[in-house]
Curated annotation (Swiss-Prot):
Mg(2+) binds at D494, D500. Belongs to the polyribonucleotide nucleotidyltransferase family. The gene is pnp. Signal peptide: none annotated. Residues 642-711 form the S1 motif domain. Pfam families: KH_1, PNPase, RNase_PH, RNase_PH_C, S1. GO terms for cellular component: cytosol. It is found in: Cytoplasm. Its cofactor is Mg(2+). GO terms for biological process: mRNA catabolic process; RNA processing. This is Polyribonucleotide nucleotidyltransferase. GO terms for molecular function: 3'-5'-RNA exonuclease activity; magnesium ion binding; polyribonucleotide nucleotidyltransferase activity; RNA binding. Involved in mRNA degradation. Catalyzes the phosphorolysis of single-stranded polyribonucleotides processively in the 3'- to 5'-direction.
């Protein structure tokens, strides 16, 4: 897209251009990476609405099907409601831009980003953030930017800035870093249990990587930037502020909000607000002040009161210290019939999580215009009904906030899920928020993890989440001179504080994270403190969680579908499917079992049913049609309990190894069954391709999983040897 002005970031292959397209917008910039183009505009309303006391910033990102050379699906053949990816990208852009608008600036601002071309190599979300920054920076809209964004991957132990979509499949880290020249402004992403120290190194790498982008945006501003406009700032009148501060001094407000339950605190503040309104009416007269006067001053007073108790007294509104966690409760199996369920509660925040297992065909298809993953077999849906905060309201589909919170919890749990070849199920977790007073997304992670364990999903390690907040005091030059990080923030501490830093992970490292700020940047020193503080809190929460269920259940719920894997000749896949799917449909309809065929043409067939007879009939039909087959996917004889086998190690995992005992038929030898001493790492005993001797110690009746033991086999063989040596010679 050729335009009048352009700058390039050669280190990252990014080009910003402007000046010829959408010239009536306050700011308009095209961002090109490879052949992926995102066009971003920024516009501002010239007036505010009467009585408005909040900042209406709207960010909308849309992907055009034409960008990928495709027609939209459906009857109308045009783009419709925003997809989940579009919503998440919009939120990704909104969060770092919002805190940089001037206090009291309440004119509506709208940022629109459109994907105009997609090369299926480079993702578009980072371009959206950088484009919004550039559009705001060159516009006349008052804004304390620019900012810049970069994605950081870790591939084979090395950090990579702005990796391609294909490179991300090999990465153990997905970090989106947004910052300015000095500080970080927003981060989000996921990781494969990255240690905190390594995570901090990744943040430093991200900060270094954005500097060329910031330099380029400033060059663009120098070429064509508009002078910043003058807009009236909304605030309380001096007369109203003086009256309210006299009637409700900070100490009275501290007394109202200190050391009480949420409902009591809210009622006490409400009474003080009514008292202040009565004083305004008495001294200024009816109609001589507005709700804006009252609301703005009361927000300021509460802002001062909450941080005064923390910064000066070291005690928070509910009486806790800086690092104290609210009382924790965890229960599993709270509901019958469901495949897995759990209740997790932290203080007033409470969630119920439900897990459902299904066949792989229940995976969600993704219409990925920019490329990447085409489906996902793990879903986490977050619901926030109005009763959770004691209010009435709409009870319909999920909003942007619910989609965002669900995505955070989902990506925090994905790194510990078993691979599909170990656990070939689609999994859906639903987090129902029953009561809310801060950090409901972190409660969703804790409850969701417990419900997975209750459902018998063999997760690699349990995951817990915690949120850290921040209270700051600025010097006269605007720099932070005093600060305190606080663990497990309340809803009020989130609202009146400066930071919401959500961190989730296992005992080994971080799996999910999200940082949101209300200040103009977070120094690295504070970020490091919060990260380590969150680690300590996470360990405490994990203890409580594991107290309710120490490990995933060995067996699935009796209501969950059973699964058997059958190996057929790949050349007979077409025979099993039949013309137009006729054969596989007939088997499904006559037996009642569900049948999935692996998409990799390996010949693996998955048979699902919660009825043993239906499953066996389906397996027999497939076996008679295609030959081979049998429980466990065997072409050889089925594994039998009590027998000893010498087989080949086909998979090495953190929790044990898989051994093929007969052709196409394998089982799991748990790490605890590898030797008669404690094995720290599976690789210390066996490696991929090794030949080992194991004994079948059990087969789960519902799931068909085969349990093997090297320890039991060695013990039995040693006993046989001693017995033969002790026998008298004939």
């Amino acid at each position: 897209m050729n335009q009048k002005y352009s700058v390039t970031v050669p280190e990252l292959g990014i080009t910003f251009s402007t000046g010829s397209i959408a010239q009536l917008a306050n700011g308009a910039v095209n961002v090109q990476v490879g052949e992926t183009n995102v066009f971003v505009t920024a516009c501002v309303a010239q007036t505010t609405k009467p009585g408005q006391d909040w900042f209406p910033l709207t960010v909308d990102y849309r992907e055009k099907y034409a960008a990928a050379g495709r027609f939209p699906g459906g009857y109308f053949k045009r783009e419709g409601r925003p997809s989940e990816k579009e919503i998440l990208t919009s939120r990704l852009c909104d969060r770092p831009c919002r805190p940089l608008f001037p206090e009291g600036f309440l004119n509506e601002v709208q940022i629109i980003g459109q994907l105009f071309s997609a090369d299926l190599v480079n993702e578009s979300d980072i371009s959206m953030v950088n484009g919004a920054s550039a559009a705001l920076a060159i516009s006349d809209i008052p804004w304390n930017g620019p900012i810049a964004a970069v994605r950081v991957a870790e591939i084979e132990g090395k950090f990579v800035a702005n990796p391609t979509i294909d490179q991300m499949f090999a990465s153990s880290l997905d970090l989106i870093y947004v910052g300015n020249e000095k500080d970080m402004l927003m981060i989000e992403g996921s990781a494969d249990q990255i240690p905190e120290e390594r995570f901090i190194e990744a943040l430093a790498f991200g900060h270094e990587s954005i500097q060329p982008i910031l330099k380029a945006i400033k060059e663009l501003v120098a070429q064509c930037g508009k002078p910043k406009g003058t807009f009236p700032l909304v605030g309380a009148t001096p007369e109203a502020r003086t009256i309210i501060e006299r009637v409700v001094p900070t100490e009275r407000l501290i007394e109202a909000i200190f050391g009480k339950e949420k409902a009591v605190r809210a009622n006490a503040v409400k009474l003080l607000k009514e008292e202040a309104k009565a004083a305004l009416t008495a001294e200024l007269g009816e109609g001589k002040f507005t709700d804006v006067d009252l609301n703005v001053v009361f927000e300021d007073l509460q802002y001062k009161a909450y941080r005064k108790t923390v910064l000066e007294r070291g005690v928070r509104a509910d009486g806790r210290g800086q690092k104290d966690i609210r009382p924790l409760q965890a229960q599993v199996g709270v509901l019958p019939r469901v495949h897995g369920s759990a209740m997790f509660q932290r203080g007033d925040t409470q969630n119920i999580a439900l897990t459902t297992l299904g066949p792989t065909k229940d995976a969600q298809d993704l219409d990925a215009l920019t490329g990447g993953v085409k489906s996902k077999s793990f879903l986490l849906h977050y619901n926030f009904p109005p009763f959770s905060v004691g209010e009435t309201g709409r009870f319909t589909g999920p909003g942007r906030r619910e989609i965002g919170h669900g995505a955070l919890a989902e990506r925090s749990l994905v790194p510990v899920l078993p691979p599909e070849d170990v656990f070939p199920y689609s999994i859906r977790v639903v987090s129902e928020i029953m009561a809310s007073n801060g950090s409901t997304s972190m409660a969703s992670i804790c409850g969701g993890c417990l419900s997975l364990m209750d459902a018998g999903v063999p997760i690699i390690a349990p995951v817990a989440g915690i949120s850290c907040g921040l209270m700051t005091q600025n010097a006269s030059d605007g720099s932070i001179e005093k600060w305190v990080t606080i663990t497990d923030i309340l809803g009020e501490e989130d609202h009146f504080g400066d930071m919401d830093f959500k961190l989730a992970g296992t005992s080994k490292g971080i799996t999910g994270f999200q940082l949101d700020l209300k200040i103009n940047g977070l120094p690295f020193e504070i970020a490091k403190t919060a990260i380590m503080q969150a680690r300590d809190a996470r360990m405490e929460i994990l203890k409580v969680m594991l107290g309710s269920l120490p490990a995933p259940r060995a067996d699935l719920s009796k209501y969950a579908p059973r699964i058997q894997t059958i190996q057929i000749d790949p050349e007979k896949i077409g025979l099993l499917i039949g013309p137009g799917g006729k054969t596989i449909r007939r088997i499904t309809e006559t037996t009642g079992a569900q049948i999935d065929i692996a998409e990799d043409d390996s010949g693996k067939v998955f048979v699902y049913s919660n009825n043993a007879e239906a499953m066996n009939r389906a397996i027999q039909e497939i076996d008679s049609l295609c030959g081979g087959g049998g429980p466990g996917g065997s072409k050889g004889p089925a594994i039998e309990v009590g027998k000893i086998y010498t087989g080949r190690v086909t998979g090495v995992k953190e929790f044990g190894c898989f051994v093929e005992c007969t052709p196409g038929n394998e089982g799991l030898c748990h790490v605890s069954e590898l030797a008669d001493f404690r094995v720290r790492r599976t690789e210390d005993v066996v490696k991929m391709g090794d030949s080992i001797t194991v004994k079948c110690i059990g087969i789960d009746e519902r799931s068909g999983k085969v349990r093997l033991s090297r320890k039991a086999a060695m013990k039995e063989l040693e006993a046989q040897k001693q017995s033969s040596e002790a026998a008298p010679a004939q």
